[in-house]
Amino acid sequence: MMSRIRWFLAGLIAVAVVAGLAVVVPRIGESGEIAADFAEYAPTPQFTERTTETFYVPMSDGTKLAVLLHRPAENGQAVDGRFPVIWHHKLDIYPSPKDGVGPKEAGYSNLTSMSDQGYVVAQVARRGNGQSFGVRRGYHDRVEAQDAYDVTEWLATQPWSNGQVGVYGCSNTGDAAMHAVSMRPPHLKAAFAGCFSWNKYDAMRRGGIAAQWGYGPTRKVEDDLALTPVSGDDDKTLLRQAAEQHQLSTPLAQMWAGMPYRDDYSTLVGSRFWAEGSLSTYADQIRESQVPLYIVGGWRDEFRDQGIVTALNTSGSKLLIGPWRHCENPGLALVQEAQRFFDFHLKGIDTGIDEAPPIRYAIVDSIDDPTGDIDWRTAESWPPTSSGLTDFALGGDGVLGSTAPGTSRFTVDTVVECPDAGEGSTVQPCHVPGAGASFVGAALEKDTEVTGTPIADVTVRVDRDDAHIFAYIEDVAPDGTVSVITEGRLTASLRGETEAPYELPAEVPFHRSYREDAQSLTPGEATRMRFDILPMSYVFRAGHRMQVTVTGYDQRETIPLPDAQGSSVEIVSDPSAPSLVQLPVAQS
């Protein structure tokens, strides 16, 4: 094990001269000892002031992007010297809910406070967005990725920069951060990214079904004119020019709707955009960059599988999964953990993160937001246990674990509502009594942990030539309350399985979902289909019951099948080929 270097320079800001340049060496905390365990890294701030300036920077094609810059300051003046830089590639140089980073205390939106710790922090509006000029061609296209390269290298060569640059973000800005990595800028040394997509099709049209919460930004001129302009543009002349350019941007909802298959070509952008906008397309470049990654997700986030798959395909990554919804972090000072990561990679401080386990995840027993200490576990790989998958048959008698033959029939209702589901990026699935077929198990005699990626393996009989099939893993409390823990879904016509082009968790089937792969159902004929269910780490408490519910519609669907309403779906249970779910039950 690499020996730790302990720093004992408490209360001191030293300035060294290297090659004739002033380099600020960080002041160490009062304890004098930096290396720390998870969630314990909290150095004393070096500065209590910062300067803020806004301006435009031209990209390699001449398009001007808006930048907001925070620099460490003393007595109202920016401190001389060179500092590491972290930056955020976003939709507006000022905080915006459209960025998806959330308002949580000590979360992503507060990483600007790292100027207090001796960092220059930059917010850059992506082209076609916010105060920046240009046209948004797609959503995380290669033009935008080139901008990320240009911005990184520009930041590295400024007089207040020491050339060590990191990037961060969550949600669409997490994708932007990862696309920056894919461009391999020479000065990019670390990326801290949360709740992003590894493969855009699997994230935004998982199972061939559009049932998430967004298409990307769509704005009117008056929306952009309501923004705060950059300094010197008090009459918003430049802001109006930029806003008018934005109106030429690709209509994203139309683009996504026009690509139901993974290999579809979009005439709006002139490419097969599911591939162009997917990090998985640039997996080799990301690995070749050797940029250290810290990947963050949440068990109630729609993209939690994407972070796991990214970690499986990028050696040396750190993966953190909390009990959270999209880009939220209650119960953890995320800024401090980000600083622990950046201090190691951008400042060379021994923060202990290099020796931390590659995977840290929360195990939960409730879908409620955490209010106390989080039960954190660590692992060297995913899934973290070697217990494998346990079969739970969907019995014809409606009992989970029963091999009784029979069928469970339901009628699809596309007008069901989900009370208290939330909205926007944190919308959740919910159990709607009677909306599908439910299979409930016996009351558990002991606490039962399920950690990993479940698999649904069901035989369906439908009176249409296609269907959207959803499977929910649920917890039934002793009082009868039903909580959806996780869910999976698949368009029946896209049930064909092929070898995945990148590593997936063990046993997870891959559906290529090319246009030529579509296989219509024969109405009334039993058809088998397998699909993964979003990963989980959950303890079903003794006295609770496990339940699986299968439906043909989810209230989050934005593009339901046109003839789904009123269709009949049967779940076929037969001892020779039972419908079942496979759960990664941890063995005690």
Question: How would you name each of these model-derived features?
Answer:
Residues 39-81, 444-446:
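N-terminal cap/lid segment of alpha/beta-hydrolase-fold proteins
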Residues 2-26:
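Secretory targeting and sorting signals
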